[in-house]
């Protein structure tokens, strides 16, 4: 739903929209979805070598593309900024904008530098998130130079989703029961990297197709 808020306006304007997003998987998924619809989009991520990055940025600057997805760490590089001057930027988009406040002060400080793009590019800026508290929203606006009148909020109720808390003694047994009774694919969130691997092994040993994902995986594994 958030993507429509910037993809449709960007399609109506000349130039290319720069979309800042935190995760390679999310980046690739959105680029693939756009390309599948005949909308030219590309991305630059940490899994690419310098030659691939150079080609992608050259295409963004001189080719007929509508969207360029990048991580916040890419914005401050010399190579990116040299090509940025050649781009006809239609929008600057900060997707998952809560990361500015929640990640920027700790392990991804480049999130705090996104606002500097406004002095380099004369283009509208939009920041989107579905998980901002009032404090986080204020921090986002301060970091990006937004005024209070530019803040648009909507309700969080989603009639197609439900949150249910069930207390149980045998959590693993309950998980197996859910896997057996509920059709489709599910996601299980746990507290540690080690636990993701242990739980995946447990499910696999019980005949349930499973894999695990965490930040400690290599680029190839995370992409697959």
Features from the language model and the residues they span:
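Helicase motor core with emphasis on the C-terminal RecA-like subdomain
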Residues: 9-13, 28-224
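P-loop NTPase Walker A phosphate-binding motif
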Residues: 24
């Amino acid at each position: 739903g958030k993507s429509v808020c910037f993809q449709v306006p960007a399609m109506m304007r000349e130039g290319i929209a720069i979309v800042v997003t935190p995760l390679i998987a999310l980046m690739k998924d959105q680029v693939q979805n756009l390309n599948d619809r005949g909308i030219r989009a590309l991305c630059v991520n940490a899994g690419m070598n310098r030659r691939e990055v150079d080609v992608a940025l050259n295409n963004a600057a001189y080719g007929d593309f509508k969207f360029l997805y990048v991580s916040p760490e890419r914005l401050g590089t010399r190579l990116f900024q040299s090509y940025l001057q050649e781009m006809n930027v239609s929008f600057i988009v900060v997707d998952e904008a809560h990361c500015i406040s929640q990640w920027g002060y700790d392990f991804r400080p480049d999130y705090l530098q996104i606002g500097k793009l406004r002095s380099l590019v004369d283009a509208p800026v939009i920041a989107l998130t579905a998980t901002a508290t009032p404090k986080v929203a204020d921090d986002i606006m301060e970091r990006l130079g937004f005024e209070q009148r530019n803040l648009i909020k909507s309700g969080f109720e989603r009639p197609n989703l439900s949150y249910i808390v069930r207390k149980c003694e045998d959590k693993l047994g309950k998980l197996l029961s859910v896997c057996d009774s509920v059709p489709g694919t599910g996601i299980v969130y746990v507290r540690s990297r080690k636990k993701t691997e242990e739980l995946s092994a447990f499910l696999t040993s019980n005949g349930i197709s499973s894999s695990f994902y965490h930040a400690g995986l290599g680029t190839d594994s995370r992409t697959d």
